[in-house]
Design a protein with these regions (language model features):
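Charged, compositionally biased non-catalytic regions
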Residues: 1-25
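Secretory-pathway lumenal glyco-enzymes, predominantly type II signal-anchor Golgi glycosyltransferases
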Residues: 6, 34, 43-48, 205-212
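Short, solvent-exposed loop/turn elements at domain surfaces
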Residues: 10, 68-70, 197
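Intrinsic-disorder-associated interaction segments
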Residues: 13, 94-97, 114, 216, ...
């Protein structure tokens, strides 16, 4: 939820406080350059943070997309090589990922919140240390970026823990197998009626990343039944037991007798 606090569509360097647990402090803002029609020229997509009590623990958080169904309409779901992790060791085949996600991932820019120094994705990855433990997390489009980033960071020898919510499939079977080897701890959280994690689908040679945790918002009568709310982050968190999460527009209205 912390990334959602900072989210203003189209804003490259968001301002304002963000509530992080304990001694965690935000260190960088992450923006992506639009390469698809429905996104702005440059859009804030997340942040990095460091635990001051344990500087060897860093987090990379990506927020979700309000345009996920636009993405479904606009992306072609073509697979392309993913150059950040080499080949899949079990089959010696190059891993392939969804072209649009890969283009957005390659466009990421990391801006230091104190100095304003900007790093490209390649520069960020060059700083990855195997002495640091990284946690990556994301929802929806952010979950797709988190999966790609987790694999790329893990490929550089670091220990990675990944949490993705409502994320679509991002690559083929070779990517899924490589991801399982590279990301030591992975939680892929999927709401049963949400269609997005089922896309683009196995018929197009895509495969889900492992360690899926299935939840079901249909078991909660207070959550509205619609495609948008099945996919919404608050529905996910509420179903997972977040008592402080406000369902907002996804709360089903009860009829007055």
């Amino acid at each position: 939820m912390a990334a959602e606090q900072l989210y203003k569509r189209g804003e490259k360097d968001p301002v304002g406080a963000v509530r992080l647990p304990g001694q965690w402090r935000r260190t960088q803002n992450i923006a992506m350059q639009a390469r698809v029609e429905f996104l702005h020229q440059s859009e804030f997509i997340g942040f990095t943070a460091r635990d001051l009590d344990n500087p060897q623990h860093e987090a990379i958080v990506f927020h979700g997309s309000q345009t996920i169904f636009d993405w479904i309409d606009d992306f072609e779901f073509s697979l392309d090589s993913f150059p950040y992790i080499g080949t899949n060791w079990s089959s010696d085949m190059p891993v392939r990922t969804e072209y649009g996600f890969t283009q957005l991932y390659e466009s990421l820019r990391f801006t230091d919140v104190e100095t304003g120094t900007v790093q490209s994705l390649a520069q960020f990855l060059s700083t990855v240390s195997n002495e640091v433990s990284y946690t990556v997390a994301g929802h929806s489009l952010g979950g797709a970026l988190a999966a790609l980033h987790g694999a790329a960071v893990g490929y550089r020898g670091a220990h990675v823990t990944s949490y993705t919510y409502a994320a679509p499939m991002v690559g083929d079977k070779a990517f899924a197998e490589a991801y399982q080897s590279l990301v030591k701890t992975s939680y892929t959280i999927v709401n049963k009626p949400d269609i997005v994690p089922k896309l683009p689908g196995s018929l197009l040679q895509y495969d889900s990343i492992p360690q899926m945790i299935l939840i079901n918002s249909l078991e909660y009568p207070e959550i509205k039944h619609c495609l948008t709310c099945y996919h919404h982050l608050t529905s996910y968190l509420y179903t997972l037991g977040c008592s402080d999460c406000d369902l907002g527009l996804c709360r089903r209205q009860t009829r007055q007798s």
